[in-house]
Every structure is written in C-alpha cells, then in structure tokens.
UniProtKB/Swiss-Prot annotation:
Record flagged with keyword Repeat: no
Biological-process GO terms, alphabetical: division septum assembly; FtsZ-dependent cytokinesis
UniProtKB keywords: Cell cycle, Cell division, Cytoplasm, Septation
Region (Disordered): 21-134
Record's GO cellular component terms: cytoplasm
Source organism per UniProt: Rhodococcus opacus (strain B4)
Pfam families in the cross-refs: SepF
Name of the protein in its database record: Cell division protein SepF
Family: Belongs to the SepF family.
Assembly information from the UniProt record: Homodimer. Interacts with FtsZ.
Function: Cell division protein that is part of the divisome complex and is recruited early to the Z-ring. Probably stimulates Z-ring formation, perhaps through the cross-linking of FtsZ protofilaments. Its function overlaps with FtsA.
Basic and acidic residues: bias regions: 28-54, 77-86, 115-127
Organism superkingdom: Bacteria
Length: 225
C-alpha cells in the first residue's frame, strides 16, 4: 500500500480493509536471541576488548614524582641526626690524670662536667671576638609559636639569633621555621641550620661563613645558658 493510500485510509477516505490487513498480518516469528554470555561461561566481548583496547606499556620514568615544595621539605630536611658535641670522659682522664685511681673513680662525674665547661669557654673566646659581628649573638628557646614575635624583634634590630626549637613540638617547630625563613628573606638576611631543630638567623650586614656555623655546632654554643 502506498503512503497516499495509507493516508486516505487513516482519514476514512478509502475502505479500511486494505489498511488494516497490512498492519494486522501475523508478524514474522522473531529470531531467538543469542544465548547469554553467562550461559556459555564466556564473555562475547572479551576477545574484542582484549584486541581493540589493549593496555599500553607505561614507562615508570614518565611518571616519576616531582620535587616537593621547598617549604614542606625544609623542616624534614632539618631532621638529620644530631651529632653530640660533648667531650668524652676518656679524653678528660687522659689529659688530667688523678693521683689515685679510687679518688678518680669517685669524682669522675664532677671532673667531666667541669672540664667540658672549660673547653667550651676556651673555644668561645676566639670564635666571638669582642666587637666582632657575632659578639652580640643571642640564643632563644621558644616553647610555642607565640614567641615568634620576640625572635622577629631581635632579628629586626640587627642581632644574630640562634633558634633552639628542641623543646617545641614538631608542628609548632615547622611553623616557626617557615616564619623565620620568610623573615630572613624579607629583611635580606640569611637562615641556616646549625644542628637538629637549631637554626641561625643572621642580619644582612653579618656574613656567617660555613666554618663559623660548623664551629658553633661543635662548641654547642646554642646549648649554653
């Protein structure tokens, strides 16, 4: 039946028999759907997926992690093992032998402390010459981040500051390290590590060499009261 005839039959312009016969014929038997993949135990798309969508070979080098932010790594890098600067009692006994072994054994602890203090004082003399740039150096031992203002004021006045953060928690110590690094950058100074959780803030007009920083760490100047 043509489209025009169908149109006329729909609006009653021609007999409906021909129109109905075509649409009321018995439909052809439908084909039985393919057996589901789960019945055969095989995924019909498995082979095609493997063929068309094969996983590419990735190179580990292309996905190597980048360098972390400097501010996040600063504090972690400062957590290197701390080397003790104490004078061993053996060296003290060999340099200053006692007349009696019994007496030396009974006063061993006191002699070790006194001798260590003498050695520290003797080293501080040539390191911080009177009138030198490090003669007015000061050591601050903050217990929380609230004491950052004191550090900033001392440094702003041109005083070299040693920050001893050993008694602070790691979280507060990291915040104070970030603050001090920004302060040194803003005032064109320098910010250096002396020992584990111990740092030196130097004003712009004071140049502290690597040798001087090493000697500060060896003498344990920051640990003196």
């Amino acid at each position: 039946m043509s489209s025009l005839h169908k149109f006329k039959a729909y609006f009653g312009m021609v007999p409906l028999d021909d129109y109905e016969d075509e649409y009321l014929d018995e439909p052809e038997p439908t084909r039985r759907p393919a057996r589901p993949a789960r019945d055969s135990g095989r995924d019909p798309y498995h082979d095609r997926d493997d063929r068309d969508f094969a996983e590419p070979a990735f190179s580990k080098a292309a996905y190597a992690p980048g360098r972390r932010d400097d501010l996040d790594d600063d504090f972690d890098r400062y957590e290197s093992p701390r080397h003790s600067s104490r004078v061993e009692p053996v060296a003290v006994r060999s340099a200053r032998p006692s007349a009696s072994g019994a007496v030396r054994g009974s006063t061993r602890g006191a002699l070790a402390v006194d001798t260590r203090s003498d050695r520290v004082e003797s080293r501080r003399g040539p390191l911080f010459d009177e009138g030198g740039p490090l003669s007015k150096i000061t050591t601050l031992r903050p217990r929380d981040y609230g004491e950052a203002r004191t550090i900033g004021e001392r440094f702003r006045d041109g005083t070299p500051v040693i920050m001893d953060l050993v008694e602070m928690s790691n979280a507060d110590a990291k915040r104070l390290v970030d603050f001090a690094a920004g302060l040194a950058f803003a005032l064109r100074g320098s910010f250096d590590k002396v020992a584990t959780k111990v740092f030196l803030l130097s004003p712009a007009d004071i140049d502290v060499s690597a040798e001087e920083r090493r000697r500060i760490a060896e003498t344990g100047f920051y640990s003196q009261k």
